[in-house]
Amino acid sequence: KAIPTSFMEQGMRAQKTFCEDGAFLNSLKGVWLEKLSSSNTPQFERLAIFWLNHFSVNFNMYKQKHAFFQHLKFVRQNANKNYLGYLKGIIKDPAMITYLNNEKSYAQNPNENLAREFLELFSLGQGHYQENDIKNLARHISGNSINFVTEKFHKYNYKTSTENYSAFGKKYKNDKEFFEILRAHPSFGEFIAKKFYKEYVELDEPSKEDLAYLVTYFKNSNFEIPEMLRATLYLKKFWEKKLSLIKSPLELFYGTARTLNYSGLDNNHISLIDNMEESGQRLFNPPNIAGWPNGKEWLGGQKLEKSILNGECKLQWK
């Protein structure tokens, strides 16, 4: 069961939408990280961070406060629900639409950013689609835009192509038909199964047997996210005692704080946020649409070890 997102509304109400960008962002960081450090369901919080990185949006690129706030709610409200539902929602997410410039798309001149990233980074992964699939999807969603007054989703029919489209050799006319075709794609489910494996098990690619098990389990559950997680945790390799994962700065600092019962957090978590950002991870401002790096990429050019060895965290333990 997903945790209510009313706690984030506290930060939204406290800073309103007319406050300066830094105050707004720090408010949201504070309430998100407070939940991360004190939640009774830390596994949900890890899932939420996983999906926040999967559907990656950089606030500083466009600084639309209400749209970004709605994006965070969207991520949390669906983190423990259905993967297909997530995908259906992300092509109508105002923050993602703006981040990938789909509001500038027209039927006669479609912007392909959202369509390309949807297939490459959100659903299928490289090698499982053709350029023509991108072009058709871009035309299909060319009217998916944003009302810049309310910063909510708005579909402009005059910008939408009325032609028939095709995906993976099959024709479709609307969202429903497209997602039915996507769901039937022989590789659908593999991409996200690999990401779960690398998030929870090890950084290496899963074996053919483990991948087949994960995908089959996922498909049989109608792509329910809790079942994907359950299947991942059932894997024998998950329980092997070996150093197979590398923590991000966020995982390291907040995991340590929870484990050691850290009691020195101020209301806005400034000390840990500063250390995390000095180590290369700025919450809500990932480097690009692919999100934060994982694994060994965190080991190079970091201040992480220096921050810990020099005692910059100034932690006070119970």
In which residue ranges do the predicted regions lie?
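N-terminal accessory alpha/beta regions
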Residues: 1-78
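An amphipathic, hydrophobic-aromatic interaction surface with interspersed Lys/Arg
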Residues: 38-41, 53-77, 81, 85, ...
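Glycine-rich, acidic and aromatic/proline-enriched surface loops and short helix-turn segments
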Residues: 49-60, 92-96, 140-147, 172, ...
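Long, well-ordered, tryptophan-enriched scaffold segments
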Residues: 3-8, 135-174
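Flexible, low-complexity segments enriched for small/polar residues
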Residues: 1, 193-221, 229-318
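Stable alpha-helical elements in mature extracytoplasmic
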Residues: 29, 43-47, 67, 71, ...
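Cell-wall polysaccharide-cleaving catalytic domain and substrate-binding groove, primarily
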Residues: 1, 55, 92-98, 104-105, ...
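Activity-critical C-terminal alpha-helical subdomain
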Residues: 89, 93-136, 140-141, 149
